[in-house]
Design a protein with these regions (language model features):
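Short secondary-structure junctions
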Residues: 26-37
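Conserved C-terminal structural/oligomerization subdomain of aldehyde/semialdehyde dehydrogenase
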Residues: 3, 19, 24, 39-180
Length: 180
C-alpha cells in the first residue's frame, strides 16, 4: 500500500513510541514498520504499517488514539462482545467490520457508537463531501467542519412557508388555512 509521511518529527517519534510501548506491554508485534527507509526520502517522517495482535483493554495502545499506521487486534469471543468493546471505549473516531453477511454489517452500522463506520473496507475515510470526524472524545471541537455540516455552519438558514390561495382578488381572511 501507499502512505505519505507523518507531519512532524515529533509525530513520528510519538508513533514509534507507541509501537515500543505496545511491545513492552506484551502485545505481539506481527508487522513492524518502524525502520522503513525510502530511497531519496531518508529525511522524511516515514513509518511503515505496524500490526499488533493479542492487545488487551488495559494496554495504552488500546486506550489511546495513536493517529499513525498502527492497527491492534483485540480478540473477542462473539459479535456482541465486539460491539460492547467498541461502544464502551471513550473514543469513537472510526471502526471497521469485515463480513460476508449483510445482516451483520447492517446491525454493526446501526449499533456501533463511532463517527465513521467501514464495512469491508479498512479505515473509513469518506470522500470530500461527507463529514469527517468521530464521536465522543475523538471529535475535535463541537462540529464536523468538513462536508454538509461545515456548509450548514457557514450558511444562514432561511425557512419560507407559503400558501398560494386561488384567485388574486379574494377578500382578506383572518383564519388558519387548512387543507380541503
Amino acid at each position: 500500500s501507499e502512505m505519505g509521511p507523518l507531519v512532524t518529527k515529533e509525530h513520528l517519534e510519538r508513533v514509534k513510541g507507541y509501537v515500543d510501548l505496545g511491545v513492552k506491554e506484551g502485545a505481539k508485534l506481527i508487522v513492524d514498520g518502524r525502520d522503513i527507509k525510502l530511497q531519496g526520502y531518508e529525511n522524511g517522517y516515514y513509518i511503515g504499517g505496524c500490526l499488533f495482535d493479542h492487545v488487551k483493554k488495559d494496554m495504552r495502545i488500546y486506550k489511546e488514539e495513536i493517529f499513525g499506521p498502527v492497527l491492534s487486534v483485540v480478540r473477542v469471543t462473539n459479535f456482541d462482545e465486539a460491539l460492547q468493546l467498541i461502544n464502551d471505549h471513550e473514543f469513537g473516531n472510526g471502526t471497521s467490520i469485515y463480513t460476508r453477511d449483510g445482516d451483520v454489517g447492517r446491525t454493526f452500522a446501526n449499533k456501533i457508537k463511532v463517527g465513521m463506520v467501514g464495512i469491508n473496507i479498512p479505515i473509513p475515510v469518506p470522500v470530500a463531501f461527507h463529514s469527517f470526524g468521530g464521536w465522543k472524545r475523538s471529535l475535535f471541537g463541537d462540529l464536523h467542519m468538513h462536508g454538509p455540516e461545515g456548509v450548514k455552519f457557514y450558511t444562514k438558514l432561511k425557512t419560507i412557508t407559503s400558501r398560494w390561495p386561488s384567485g388574486i382578488g379574494s377578500d382578506p381572511e383572518f383564519v388558519m388555512p387548512t387543507m380541503k
